[in-house]
Amino acid sequence: MLTDGSYFHLHLVSDSTGETLITVSRAVAAQYANVNAVEHVYPLVRSQKQLDRVLQEIEESPGIVLFTLLEGELVARLEAKCQEINSPSLSIIGPVMQLFEAYLGASTTGRVGAQHTLNAEYFKRIDALNYSMMHDDGQHVEGLEEADVVLVGVSRTSKTPTSIYLANRGIRTANVPLVAGIPIPHQLETLKKPLVVSLHASPERLIQVRQNRLLSLGAGAGNDSYIDRQSVTDEVLLARKLSAKYGWSLLDVTRRSIEETAAAIMKLLADRQRQRMSE
């Protein structure tokens, strides 16, 4: 049994965007306020090779596995691995489909992602997801100008899950870590098109989250700079100075959920777009 304040890994595996899984899992996780889910979202898993990469991550960080996969072989392989490593797994749409089949007397078409109308909005979301996954954690900084939003922040300010959440809303989102002693990518200094949002949290909150992260990985919570109070405080101050220097929007995420953070960013983006249209 998990104790108050502890973390568990939650793996969400989908052959489509993963939005259904995210919505359902967060609605349930919200009922357990004293424990925190470390989300691992795997959208567009449609081949054995893609699934193998997912299974490797699940094996490295066992936890609850929820999935929306329609391909029988992929389902069987996922369930077998989860059973092998004693990770509970559940198909979110499986029981619902069984109920429909029993009532309608007909089987499903088996079309992956059939719940999504193939319109411009759908393809926009897929494009945003692909972009965000390619530009996670400071990767491919040469493509930052193509983003709608660029998130920056020190470690454990929820940059990646916020990026994925925004991408599920069709917003191309990149994120770049701010690391003490490492210069920021020069591309960040000259961005024109994207909204750059600097995510901040209190040193106390960061230390708590980082300690729990280390414990979840089986690492000791020593006095290294990652969780040292003075070092973390210096990180926060440096991030604020960079934000002021480059005119990035500041957003305190200390007491915000991912949904609340994303909503605030979407409002900033909408306000910015309205301002530009009026100029």
Curated annotation (Swiss-Prot):
InterPro entries the UniProt entry points to: Kinase-pyrophosphorylase, PPDK_reg
Keyword annotations from UniProtKB, A to Z: Kinase, Nucleotide-binding, Serine/threonine-protein kinase, Transferase
Coiled-coil stretches noted in the UniProt entry, renumbered to this chain: none
Catalytic activity annotation: N(tele)-phospho-L-histidyl/L-threonyl-[pyruvate, phosphate dikinase] + ADP = N(tele)-phospho-L-histidyl/O-phospho-L-threonyl-[pyruvate, phosphate dikinase] + AMP + H(+); N(tele)-phospho-L-histidyl/O-phospho-L-threonyl-[pyruvate, phosphate dikinase] + phosphate + H(+) = N(tele)-phospho-L-histidyl/L-threonyl-[pyruvate, phosphate dikinase] + diphosphate
Residues annotated to bind ADP: G153, V154, S155, R156, T157, S158, K159, T160
Pfam entry (one): Kinase-PPPase
EC number: 2.7.11.32, 2.7.4.27
GO molecular-function term, one example from the UniProt record: ATP binding
Protein family according to the UniProt entry: Belongs to the pyruvate, phosphate/water dikinase regulatory protein family. PDRP subfamily.
HAMAP family: PDRP
PANTHER family: PYRUVATE, PHOSPHATE DIKINASE REGULATORY PROTEIN 1, CHLOROPLASTIC
General function of this protein: Bifunctional serine/threonine kinase and phosphorylase involved in the regulation of the pyruvate, phosphate dikinase (PPDK) by catalyzing its phosphorylation/dephosphorylation.
UniProt name for this protein: Putative pyruvate, phosphate dikinase regulatory protein
